[in-house]
C-alpha cells in the first residue's frame, strides 16, 4: 500500500531518512519530518569518491545521500560541511599508502594533485564497505535481545558483512528436532541462593556464587531456575538466560583468521560471556554438512554430547555473536552445559564463561576441541568423523598451540 501524489508513490513503511530524501527529490515541504523551506535544498554528503587540485583549489568528488552516482559532483572544500568524512577520507589515503610502502610514514597531503584510478576505486569501495558494516551493526542490535551492545569493525581489508548469515538469539530447530521443551515444575523459593532449589532437585551443585560467577568445575552441568519458578528476574540462579551483559565488537583480524570478537569492557574471571547458538540438527545431518564444510575449511559444528550424541549445533548460517569467536589453544572462555526450560539431557544449552580476568579490547576465544566436560575430545566442535580426514591449521599463536584445530 502507498499514499499517492500524482504518479509519485511513498511506501507506507519507510524510515524518516527515506521520507526526507523523497521530499527533497520532489521539492516537498513537510515540517513533521523536519523538511522546511530553509533546508529543503540542503544536500548531505554520503561519502567522498575522489580528489584533485584544480587551479590551486582542492576539490572532492561527492556522492550525495539519496541520489544516484550519476549525480556525483566535484565540490571545493569550502562547500563541504562534513569534517568527519573528510578526516575519514584522509585516513583511508594514509592507510592505503602505508600498506603499499610499510617503511614509509604515509604521504604528504599537499604533494597529491590527483588520485590514481585504482586509489579512487579503493576509496569508494572502503566508503561503501563502511556503510554496509554500519547497517549490519544496526541490524545486529535490532535483532539481539540481550543488554550488551554489538559493534562491527574492519580496519584490515575490504571484507563486508557475511552474505549468508542470519542472527538468532536461541536455538533454531531443524525439522524433526524439538528444542522448546517446557519445564514441568519450578521452585517456590524466597531465596534461591540459600535454597539451592533447582540444582538440588536435579541432583547437582548450585553453579554460582553471590556475584553470579561460576563456581563449579568444568564438566558439571548448570541448572538454572525456569519459567515455572516463582522467583523473579533478579534471582541469582538466572544468569545465562538473561543473555550477554557485555558490549562486544566483531572485528576483522589481521593474521588471516577472518572475523573475531573482542570485549569492549573488562570481564571478571568466571563470568558468563555468551551462549553458543545455531541450528540444532541430527548427528546424521551433521555428518553430511561436515563434509561440505570440510572442503571450505570452516568450523561451526558443535556436538551436544553431554550424555548422548544425537544432536549437533550448526552455527554456519544461523547464530549469534559466538559465530565469530575464534579458536585458541590457550583460550579465555570455557564451555558449560546449561539446562533451563528444556531439561532434555540430549539438548543442553552451551554457555561460555571467562577462565580469567579479561581486559577491555582483548579478543575472546575458546578451544574448539574442548567439551562441556572440560576434557579434550574429538567429539566437540567441528569434529564429526567426516572432519577427521582433513586437518585444519591453527593460527592462534599461543605458546601452547597444538598446530591444528582438529
Curated annotation (Swiss-Prot):
Span of domain Chromo: 43-101
Q: What is its EC number?
A: 2.1.1.355
Q: Which domain of life is it from?
A: Eukaryota
* Matching Pfam families: Chromo, Pre-SET, SET
Residues annotated as binding Zn(2+) 3: 192, 225, 231, 235
What are the binding positions for S-adenosyl-L-methionine in this chain? 257-259, 300, 326-327
Q: Where in the cell is it found?
A: Nucleus; Chromosome, Centromere
Quote the entry's note on domains: Although the SET domain contains the active site of enzymatic activity, both pre-SET and post-SET domains are required for methyltransferase activity. The SET domain also participates in stable binding to heterochromatin. In the pre-SET domain, Cys residues bind 3 zinc ions that are arranged in a triangular cluster; some of these Cys residues contribute to the binding of two zinc ions within the cluster.
Name-wise, this protein is Histone-lysine N-methyltransferase SUV39H2
Organism of origin is Xenopus tropicalis (Western clawed frog)
Its organism's taxonomic lineage begins at: Eukaryota, Metazoa, Chordata, Craniata, Vertebrata
